[in-house]
Amino acid sequence: MTAPRVALVHERFTEYGGSEAVVAEFIKTWPGAAVFAPIVSREGHDSLVAAVASGRRGAPAHDGAADDAAGQGISIHDSWLSRAHAAIGGGAHAPLLPFVPRTLRRLPLAERFDVVVVSHHAFATQAVFATDAPVIAYVHSPARWAWDGAFRAQEAGGKPGQLALAGLGHFARRAELRAAPRLAHVIANSHAVADGVRDWWGLPATVVNPPVRIDRFTPDPSIPREDFFLFAGRLVPYKRADLAIRAVQRAGGRLVVLGDGRHRQYLETIAGSETTFLGAAPDHVLLDMYRRCRAVLMPGVEDFGIVPVEAMACGAPVLAVAAGGALDTVRPGRTGEYVEFGDDTAVVEGMACLIRDFDPSRYDPAAISRHAGTFAPTAFRARIGDVVARAAG
């Protein structure tokens, strides 16, 4: 049987994160698939190529934004927006977002592919207008800043930012609703995202949790758990590191914050001697922290959340709010505990109570690590391949 011709559409390759890791696994699932993204930076391109190469022999080289990457079957196609992104310094991509939907609607997909798989945050589903082939959307989240007013206000940072994001949000909602009826199938990365797809798009979704590179994170029983809790991740408002800091202060504990971002300066003003900021750090430092902390704190609501799974792969329990992607990953009494979701005061008090009474000896690190194994890339590739094959008919 002839292998299907698959196109993969992502919104941008300007940095490497969880959604780019998903695309890397897409490429391993469908070798030779063409990859399209309106905005591609050199760093973003090279990070994707390295991630794909890590799962097979040979590392493809960079020959421009539209290339067949060193015989590895990866062709990455961008647009004029890549050059515009470089011209404005290669930093923030937000000024280019209004041009992304039109660019996606003009992708050269017609009559070239049997199925198109899009990796969607806000605009990728616009590719549905560029082809008559079945389009299957893997949704990291419907544009949360577009649909959720509270989230938008939290992220915008001041009145001018709120106005700009409100306008862009209206634009994104219209784009998503226009594309949704034409999708052949929707796959959500968590049950919380599936609920958003149902409520905002009016569509059902199959849940396939994203892959987590747990091979990089393993337990070490010879390393004892120490007397500190860990927050790891980008220091941006919605991650709610501020709640972790306040909860540890309330409980009289110690906290290590691993990560960096625009919210760090504010966080340092509310933290005291109980909190240590390590900044951004390589994997070996993160691994060491996962192995030594009493537990990882997850006070923010994530669409999925990679950090809890990485921590559990190292045998570390996770204390998380009972909302969002944590409902897919944390098992109370086995791999961690939930804090009842509520306002900031309730979350801080609930997490402080867990911290005060927390006893890591109640949890089996080996069982926690085995649970994390269910999110391994091999499991993801098997599930996504099966779901797409059935949806594409």
Locate predicted features.
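Nucleotide-activated donor-binding/catalytic signature segment of Leloir-type glycosyltransferases, i.e.
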Residues: 265-288
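Short hydrophobic beta-strand element within catalytic cores of glycosyltransferases
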Residues: 297, 317-322, 330
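Membrane-proximal helix-turn-helix segments that form the acceptor-binding/catalytic region
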Residues: 154-186, 194-195
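Conserved donor-binding/catalytic core segment of Leloir-type glycosyltransferases
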Residues: 220-256
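Conserved acidic donor-binding segment of nucleotide-sugar-dependent glycosyltransferases
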Residues: 279, 332-333, 337-346, 354-362
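Active-site donor-binding segments of glycosyltransferases and PAPS-dependent sulfotransferases
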Residues: 29-125
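Acidic donor-binding loop of glycosyltransferase active sites
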Residues: 291-303, 316
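A charged, aromatic-enriched C-terminal amphipathic alpha-helix characteristic of glycosyltransferases
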Residues: 98, 342, 359-389
